[in-house]
A protein has these predicted regions:
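Active-site neighborhoods and metal-handling regions in enzymes and metal-associated proteins
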Residues: 1-262
Length: 262
């Protein structure tokens, strides 16, 4: 069932979205060689709790951390570890969720650790740009397939592949709600977008094959050919007679990264 949010609900959803955005901005300060992914997780959890919120991901279906941290060929759902140390040339996707006042926020950003190859940087830029292509289609009266089509076409035209098994989703009192928001689609297909819908759009785009494999831990999803993947995500609200409202933000990341912001 698709739940339409009221204006009162959106007040709380904005707050949760901004907590997530600021948590990612806090993490951005520590994205550098020598830092463990477990430390990044601790930093984010401390910030989220300092806001009177709780991490959405911690213990969600048994997930053992507050962040999903996915390094290089890991597409999504990487588990932070004290043994996993960032090094020059890595790319690291940080996916963050926070729950406050009964509503979730959800966002992800893929960071560069130092300098990366030009082809990897281009993958990150294209993936982020495709997120905004999807958001541009998130208009009242459009359909979910219009979002997926926009993301898919933008990335495939540039030679990248789109992960199909992992999708965006509705967001609200539950972290994952209807409808699913695939990153592929046909124009004019799928559920119709209505004012009050709140959804997370999250392109997961690969440099090589679109095929993925699940690790034995039951969480970590990698590219089958071990080439890099990128992941960017915003939570947005469908508004009446206008464009979508982005409830999360990359502004705090940009403040930290400056000219290294993608």
């Amino acid at each position: 069932m698709i739940y339409l949010k009221t204006e009162d609900d959106l007040v709380y959803l904005r707050e949760s979205g901004q907590i997530v955005a600021k948590a990612l901005g806090t993490v951005a300060e520590f994205i550098k060689p020598g830092i463990t992914t477990k430390y990044l997780d601790q930093i984010a959890e401390e910030y989220i709790r300092s806001c009177g919120a709780v991490p959405s991901f911690l213990n969600y279906s048994g997930f053992p951390a507050s962040l999903c941290i996915s390094l290089n060929d890991v597409v999504v759902h990487g588990i932070p570890s004290k043994d996993q140390v960032l090094k020059e040339g890595d790319v690291v996707s940080v996916d963050c969720g926070a729950l406050k006042n009964g509503f979730h926020g959800d966002s992800a950003y893929t960071f560069r650790v130092g300098d990366v190859s030009k082809e990897t940087e281009a993958l990150l830029r294209t993936t982020k740009e495709s997120l905004y292509q999807g958001i541009a289609q998130s208009l009242e009266g459009k359909r979910v397939g219009d979002i997926g089509y926009a993301v898919q076409e933008y990335c495939q035209r540039r030679g990248y592949t789109v992960v199909r098994e992992m999708v965006g989703h509705g967001v609200g009192r539950n972290l994952h709600e209807d409808p699913e928001i695939p990153n592929v689609g046909k124009r004019g297909s799928g559920p119709q977008l209505k004012a009050g819908m709140v959804i997370a759009i999250e392109p997961m785009i690969n440099l090589g094959t679109r095929n993925i494999v699940m690790e034995r831990d039951g969480w970590t999803v990698r590219t089958a050919d071990h080439k890099p993947s990128a992941h960017f995500e915003h939570t947005i609200a469908i508004r009446k007679n206008g464009g979508a409202e982005i409830l999360t933000s990359f502004d705090y990341i940009q403040e930290v990264l400056g000219d290294r912001f993608i």
